[in-house]
């Protein structure tokens, strides 16, 4: 039977941001490959539009949001995690959680600096793998401002991460905007927080800004301290908006819709 090529473009780099000759060759290969694929999938509508221009595509790629919902591996594991971690949350604080670790390209330095304006009622949890120099820099910023409201934690398994998000108040989703891949970042990270009932504060990258404005589930603002305060002040209102949104998102339907579109294209090609 016929063979079809379906390309899922998770990353998006152009010649300008490609690293050296190997990177440029990679970009060129991707351009050729993408133009000859039967179906192309982009991470969001912004990228789909951009790819038409970049790769000279006849059709706009399908866009597919990677919607991820955290779940406990078992009820017993959930109880274990609760026993291990409940002490960590004994003190009542307004907790902000980021799963970018100390990654400075994800504007973590700015996030830490924002904590000096928020004071002791707030706490920032940085969770995830970090480059050694990024972690050192994070510690230096914390030391410089004499902060006691920032905690750096290692990467966690899904059970622990779910518990930590569940017991925090706001999720941070931030990226730099110096290359296309980051500027037009996929907003999948947002869903991890929303499914736990938490509003988000994000950087102003176009997909994140549009998402926050369209669904009212958080604030996209480059002044992180101001945005966090704004969410904290009307926290119940933001939570209600998140619950409304989550009740109207259907992961399986989202997946099925894309599968149906792909099937239609391939059937047309067979005809």
Regions inferred by a protein language model and the residue ranges of each:
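A charged, aromatic-enriched C-terminal amphipathic alpha-helix characteristic of glycosyltransferases
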Residues: 79, 83, 222-228, 233-270
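Active-site proximal beta-strand in glycosyltransferases
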Residues: 1-15
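A short alpha->beta transition loop at the rim of the catalytic pocket in nucleotide-sugar-dependent
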Residues: 169, 195-198
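Conserved donor-binding/catalytic core segment of Leloir-type glycosyltransferases
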Residues: 41, 81-106, 111-115, 125
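Helix-loop-beta element that forms the nucleotide-linked donor phosphate-binding surface
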Residues: 48-70, 75-79
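Membrane-proximal helix-turn-helix segments that form the acceptor-binding/catalytic region
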Residues: 4-7, 21-43, 53-54
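Nucleotide-sugar-dependent
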Residues: 105-106, 157-164, 171-191, 201-210
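Nucleotide-activated donor-binding/catalytic signature segment of Leloir-type glycosyltransferases, i.e.
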Residues: 128, 135-163
């Amino acid at each position: 039977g016929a063979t079809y090529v379906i390309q899922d473009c998770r990353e998006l780099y152009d010649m300008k941001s490609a690293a050296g000759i190997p990177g440029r060759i990679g970009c060129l290969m991707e351009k050729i490959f993408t133009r000859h694929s039967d179906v192309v999938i982009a991470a969001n509508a912004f990228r789909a539009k951009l790819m038409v221009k970049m790769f000279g595509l006849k059709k706009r790629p399908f866009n597919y949001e990677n919607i991820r919902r955290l779940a406990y591996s078992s009820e017993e594991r959930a109880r274990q995690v609760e026993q291990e971690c409940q002490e960590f949350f004994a003190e009542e604080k307004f907790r902000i959680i980021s799963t970018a670790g100390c990654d400075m390209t994800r504007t973590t330095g700015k996030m830490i600096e924002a904590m000096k304006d928020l004071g002791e009622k707030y706490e920032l949890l940085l969770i995830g793998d970090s480059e050694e120099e990024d972690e050192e820099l994070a510690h230096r910023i914390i030391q410089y401002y004499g902060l006691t409201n920032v905690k750096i934690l290692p990467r966690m398994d899904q059970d622990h991460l779910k518990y930590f998000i569940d017991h925090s108040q706001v999720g941070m989703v931030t990226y730099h905007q110096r290359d296309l891949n980051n500027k037009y970042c996929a907003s999948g990270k947002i869903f991890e927080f929303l499914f736990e009932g938490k509003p988000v504060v994000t950087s102003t990258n176009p997909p994140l800004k549009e998402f926050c404005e369209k669904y009212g589930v958080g604030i996209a603002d480059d002044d992180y301290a101001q945005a966090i305060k704004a969410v904290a002040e009307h926290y119940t209102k933001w939570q209600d908006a998140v619950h409304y949104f989550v009740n109207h998102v259907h992961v399986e339907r989202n997946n099925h819709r894309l599968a149906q579109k792909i099937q239609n294209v391939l059937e047309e090609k067979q005809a």
